[in-house]
């Protein structure tokens, strides 16, 4: 860990890579287009450019070096330990990239007729069948483009279900105060009123608080299991009983499903709907602007309402069909094909026993690291955690140090920072999730470095308040960035496409 001061700070800080527009040179070329063999006459004039596109101009080597340097300024699972809580930043096995690159998948056009895409349809159908087994559900849709999209899909399914039953008076969705922010946002987008379930001091759902807001107006109760505090709801059977007695549906936010693989199935726990984040639990790529995938599983009473189109098997033949009671299409085609194929490869590669080991190692790593950090900072819950845990840096406030300062110091120590200030019910929260992929040596080193940072906060807080000193950008004005964002390079505006 390097925490330097004064002139050393700027000397040791790596430079920021200029934008691609700043290194663009008029006339530079990476490729030479092939001359048209014949005159193009079938493009209407309205689609033809009247002026050049205004693209940056570089040689291929310059472009490669530019983006390679940018990648070296970033941190990812392939370069650093990445304990970003509630995000399950596990390693993505590179062998999985070979599956969507197979010519039978890669060269397939989405408008190919069913006869010409039997292998692709079979792969997606097989993936759905495997997910049904993993989740304990009766039917699956692969259409949602992300976890939050899966949430909205599940909420629309619940709305259609109650409309079909004639229970349109069910206009409320209940969400615990520890939930992901997407839960209330998705509920609102789905046309429901959101009511909050207050947690007990331990972080678990308060049954009295649940009973207080549960009524005949309740359509859905959304629960993240395990919770964002890294706790299993100790009274979940009673929660399920009360929700079902009220005639409502139970939704599981499967963002933390990495703790359950091969151990528990949402359907067996009593949930009616669940989504799973493939980029978390099934090791498909994170971020990059997409594509993503958030498959949704449902019990049989909700299956008729799943989005169209559905892949149907008849003997050895696979067809695409629409269902009359469906909520309709929620996106184009059958989902994010490259992501879904990677997730299928992951399930096939691990098998049932391998999936169980994934969760057991995730639980082991989280509890080992939590035990190593015991007594350093206050934590949430007592006893064992699940796949992640939450610490609070509130005790350091008397020294002028907050969670964000610890996170900045963690960057200087050579890691990606944990999630901070979430869950909202924990002051100065640091949410740490090591995943199953990390070695004991990595966890030991992280624990030692975090311990040194906390001791530094107690003895020399000024040093920590200057961190990070090893990154291109230190401490941007976050308020100004939020209120006056500059999202486009001024040089790009001058060359607007």
Predicted features, each with a name:
Residues 138-144, 172-175:
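A short, small-residue-rich loop immediately preceding and capping a beta-strand
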Residues 86-89, 94-96, 147, 159, ...:
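Short, glycine-/Ser/Thr-/acidic-enriched flexible segments
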Residues 157-160, 169-170, 190, 345-349, ...:
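Conserved thiamine diphosphate
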Residues 213, 335-338, 381:
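A generic short alpha-helical patch detector that favors 3-5-residue windows
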Residues 119, 149-315, 400-401, 428:
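Conserved PLP-enzyme active-site core in the AAT-like
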Residues 141, 195-197, 418:
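General small-molecule cofactor/ligand-binding pocket signal
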Residues 1-139, 264, 314-319, 323-330, ...:
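Non-catalytic terminal extensions of PLP-dependent enzymes
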């Amino acid at each position: 860990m390097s925490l330097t001061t004064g002139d050393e700070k700027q000397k040791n800080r790596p430079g920021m890579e200029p934008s691609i527009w700043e290194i663009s040179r008029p006339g530079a070329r990476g490729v030479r287009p092939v001359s048209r063999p014949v005159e193009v006459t079938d493009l209407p004039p309205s689609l033809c450019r009247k002026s050049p596109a205004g693209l940056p101009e570089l040689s291929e080597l310059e472009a490669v070096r530019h983006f390679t340097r940018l990648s070296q300024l970033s941190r990812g699972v392939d370069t650093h330990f990445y304990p970003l809580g509630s995000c399950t930043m596990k390693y993505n096995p590179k062998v999985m990239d070979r599956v969507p690159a197979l010519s039978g998948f890669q060269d397939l056009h989405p408008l190919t007729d069913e006869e010409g895409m039997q292998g692709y349809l079979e792969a997606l159908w097989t993936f759905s069948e495997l997910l049904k087994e993993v989740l304990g559900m009766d039917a699956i849709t692969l259409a949602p483009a992300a976890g939050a999209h899966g949430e909205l899909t599940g909420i629309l399914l619940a709305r259609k279900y109650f409309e079909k039953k004639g229970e349109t008076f069910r206009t409320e969705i209940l969400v615990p105060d520890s939930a992901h922010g997407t839960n209330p946002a998705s509920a609102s987008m789905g046309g429901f009123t959101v009511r909050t379930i207050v947690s007990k001091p331990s972080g678990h759902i308060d049954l009295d608080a649940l009973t207080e807001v549960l009524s005949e107006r309740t359509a859905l109760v959304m629960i993240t299991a395990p919770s964002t505090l890294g706790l299993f709801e100790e009274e979940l059977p009673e929660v399920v009983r009360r929700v079902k007695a009220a005639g409502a549906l139970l939704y599981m936010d499967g963002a933390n499903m990495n703790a359950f693989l091969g151990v528990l199935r949402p359907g067996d726990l009593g949930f009616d709907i669940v989504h799973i984040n493939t980029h978390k639990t099934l090791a498909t790529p994170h971020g990059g602007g997409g594509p993503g995938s958030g498959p949704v599983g449902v019990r049989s009473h909700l299956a008729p309402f799943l989005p169209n189109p559905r892949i149907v098997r008849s003997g050895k033949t696979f067809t695409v069909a629409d269902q009359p009671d469906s909520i309709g299409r929620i996106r184009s085609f059958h989902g994010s094909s490259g992501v879904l194929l990677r997730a299928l490869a992951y399930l096939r590669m691990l098998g049932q026993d391998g999936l169980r080991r994934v969760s057991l190692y995730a639980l082991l790593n989280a509890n080992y690291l939590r035990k190593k950090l015991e007594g350093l900072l206050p934590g949430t819950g007592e006893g064992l955690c699940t796949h992640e845990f939450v610490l609070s840096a509130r005790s350091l406030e008397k020294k002028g140090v907050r969670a964000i300062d610890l996170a900045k110091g963690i960057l200087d120590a050579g890691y990606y920072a944990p999630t901070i200030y979430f869950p909202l019910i924990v002051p100065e929260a640091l949410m740490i999730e090591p995943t199953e992929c990390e070695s004991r040596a990595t966890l030991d080193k992280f624990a030692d470095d975090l311990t040194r940072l906390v001791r530094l906060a107690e003895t020399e807080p000024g040093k920590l308040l200057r961190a990070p000193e090893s990154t291109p950008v230190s401490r941007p004005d976050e308020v100004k960035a939020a209120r006056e964002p500059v999202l486009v390079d001024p040089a790009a505006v001058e060359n607007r496409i």
